[in-house]
Regions:
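Basic/aromatic-rich interaction segments and small domains that mediate binding to polyanionic partners
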Residues: 2-85
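Non-Sec secretion/translocation targeting segments of pathogen effectors
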Residues: 84-93
Length: 93
């Protein structure tokens, strides 16, 4: 489906809601050729002028999200704390 090009105001709103380093989890990606698996987490790197979110996925992939096409959400503060705890635990072992 072709999405209309977002206005400058819409892009700025996306940038405000998704600043760099925001942690994201993918619910579903509408890409039949090379989708990222549902449940994959990643870190937002940028929002481009088309309003697409450039994400560095934890599985090593780099594929943008398209708001309105792909389903995703920010990680909750509790999920972020749990991730940080796992990383600390991994370093101790």
């Amino acid at each position: 489906m072709n999405m209309p090009f977002p206005s400058r105001e819409q892009v700025e709103s996306i940038r405000k809601n998704y600043p760099p380093d925001t942690r994201i989890v993918l619910n579903n990606m509408n890409d039949p050729y090379s989708p990222v698996e549902s449940g994959t987490r990643g870190t937002l790197r940028y929002v481009d002028d088309c309003g697409q979110l450039g994400v560095a996925w934890d599985n090593g992939r780099s594929l943008s999200l398209i708001p309105g096409e792909d389903s995703f959400r920010k990680l909750t503060q509790q999920e972020i704390i749990q991730e940080q705890g796992m990383k600390v635990g991994e370093m101790v072992l």
